[in-house]
Amino acid sequence: APEQSKSIPRGEILSLSCAGCHGTDGKSESIIPTIYGRSAEYIESALLDFKSGARPSTVMGRHAKGYSDEEIHQIAEYFGSLSTMNN
């Protein structure tokens, strides 16, 4: 296994704001979609589509617009890595 950095990855820090709706580690316990187990590519594409308005939403467009494309990439990489780290 690759050696983990002692510092917390930026994507993990940025992902903390997602937990309020999507649950800890993206495991939602409500009608809000679970993002745990989704690929980084899927999450990044969805967030970029929310940001551009290509994907309709109630609140996700506003959330996604608050992040740079690089931050969206980091968030997606973090969530995409969770299911492989925990298996």
UniProtKB/Swiss-Prot annotation:
InterPro entries: Cyt_c-like_dom, Cyt_c-like_dom_sf, Cytochrome_c_Oxidase_Subunit. GO terms for cellular component: periplasmic space. Pfam families: Cytochrom_C (PF00034). GO terms for molecular function: electron transfer activity; heme binding; metal ion binding. The keyword Plastid does not apply. PANTHER family: CBB3-TYPE CYTOCHROME C OXIDASE SUBUNIT FIXP, CYTOCHROME C4. Dimer of one cytochrome and one flavoprotein. This is Cytochrome subunit of sulfide dehydrogenase. It comes from Chlorobaculum thiosulfatiphilum (Chlorobium limicola f.sp. thiosulfatophilum).
